[in-house]
Regions:
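Basic, polyanion-binding surface patches
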Residues: 1-142
């Protein structure tokens, strides 16, 4: 996971001994944008004013966002935390997963039902991409 080296989380990541990667459904895009772009690195509580509420992970020492469709619970590998070019890179061990019951069937996890926006930022701009069930066979492009 990468984060701005000057951010609140970057300052705490080595001491909290746990973090959750929360995947929120597209219905939360307003809250996602507010936390990510408006509050960003300027506030310790970047979720203030978003309406998001939090629970406590039972697996790692970290909060999780109530309403997240999918959560990955991790512990940082402190000897593998590297800061380079203003970005703190944190390697972690996955300790658990949480997901909405509607995403599970007798056949396993239903990726096609997962409705989370994927944020992409590059020199062309910043966009949210939606997950779909469309696929392309690997190796079919050459």
């Amino acid at each position: 996971m990468g984060m701005h080296a000057g951010s609140y989380l970057a300052q705490r990541i080595e001491t909290i001994k746990g973090y959750c990667i929360n995947f929120l459904p597209t219905a939360y895009l307003h809250a996602i944008e507010r936390a990510g772009m408006v509050s960003n690195n300027r506030k310790a509580d970047k979720t203030e004013g978003t309406g998001l509420t939090f629970g406590k992970s039972l697996t790692v020492n970290a909060p999780l966002i109530n309403g997240a469709s999918f959560v990955i619970e991790c512990e940082p590998i402190t000897e593998r935390i590297v800061t380079f070019d203003g970005v703190k890179h944190v390697f972690g061990r996955i300790k658990g997963y949480l997901c909405e019951e509607s995403l599970l069937t007798d056949n396993g996890f239903e990726y096609g039902k997962l409705d989370v926006p994927l944020f992409e930022a590059d020199s062309r701009g910043r966009v949210y991409r939606r997950m779909t069930t469309d696929t392309e066979q690997a190796g079919s492009f050459f």
